[in-house]
């Protein structure tokens, strides 16, 4: 978005929006992300990791459509809120899904690749914004926003061909399907392979531990867990408060 809001075409079409309006447009994505993050867990538990990502993609298509066709600030903000809702779901469920369908020895590297892909996608969008700046009129920013359809469509097409999470299948009582999925991932379909048996036992052990531990927000702060909770929360806080601020300050 930052590559678009400084273009003459955007400024002219939206009549040189004030700082408050620009702030609302910029923060709309984060607002939607908060809602998406809050509902991601219940949705994922209900329909599974894979289908929750597919569900989020539908909101991305709607949000992008609203942005491309927007005629005023309100519509643009609404479109970005919908896109943010998608970001909130996918940012939490994609790493979980990848970890649960990957072989144990490759989980770390696969999750890292996913994060690198996000950064690479951001870089591509900057170049797209730069390239579209040469287009005359509103087609400039509408074209840039329209490219957001492309990765989403590929994801929607490809997701049905990917397996469901074995851990989610076990959680909802679909044990046979979970074991078969594990076998396809770990041992080319051999359900008696030692790796498959060990992974299945691990899943059952974790599920029993979760059931015995119970649920509730108090768990995040009881028995010294507040330190781990604070550490996890601070990662995102430091990320958005340090380097981005330094870069923005040095470029302004």
Residue ranges: model-predicted function:
Residues 185-198:
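Short intracellular "coupling" helices and adjacent cytoplasmic loop segments at the cytosolic face
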Residues 1-183, 198, 205-252:
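Transmembrane-helix signature of 12-pass secondary carriers
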């Amino acid at each position: 978005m930052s590559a678009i809001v400084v273009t003459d075409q955007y400024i002219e079409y939206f009549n040189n929006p004030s700082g408050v309006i620009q702030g609302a447009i910029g923060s709309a994505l984060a607002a939607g992300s908060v809602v998406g993050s809050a509902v991601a867990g219940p949705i994922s538990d209900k329909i599974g990791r894979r289908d929750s990502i597919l569900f989020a993609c539908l909101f991305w298509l709607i949000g992008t459509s609203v942005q491309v066709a927007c005629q005023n600030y309100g519509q643009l903000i609404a479109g970005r809120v919908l896109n943010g809702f998608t970001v909130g779901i996918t940012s939490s469920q994609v790493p979980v899904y990848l970890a649960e369908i990957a072989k144990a020895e490759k989980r770390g590297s696969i999750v890292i690749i996913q994060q690198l892909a996000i950064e690479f996608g951001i870089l591509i969008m900057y170049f797209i914004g730069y390239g579209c700046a040469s287009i005359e009129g509103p087609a400039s920013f509408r074209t840039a926003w329209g490219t957001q359809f492309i990765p989403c469509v590929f994801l929607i097409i490809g997701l049905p061909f990917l397996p469901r999470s074995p851990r989610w299948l076990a959680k909802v009582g679909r044990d046979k399907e979970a074991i078969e999925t594990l076998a396809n991932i770990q041992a080319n379909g051999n359900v008696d392979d030692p790796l498959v048996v060990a992974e299945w036992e691990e899943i059952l052990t974790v599920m029993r531990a979760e059931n015995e531990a119970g649920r509730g927000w108090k768990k995040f702060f009881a028995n010294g867990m507040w330190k781990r909770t604070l550490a996890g929360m601070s990662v995102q806080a430091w990320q958005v408060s340090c380097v981005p601020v330094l870069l923005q300050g040095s470029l302004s």
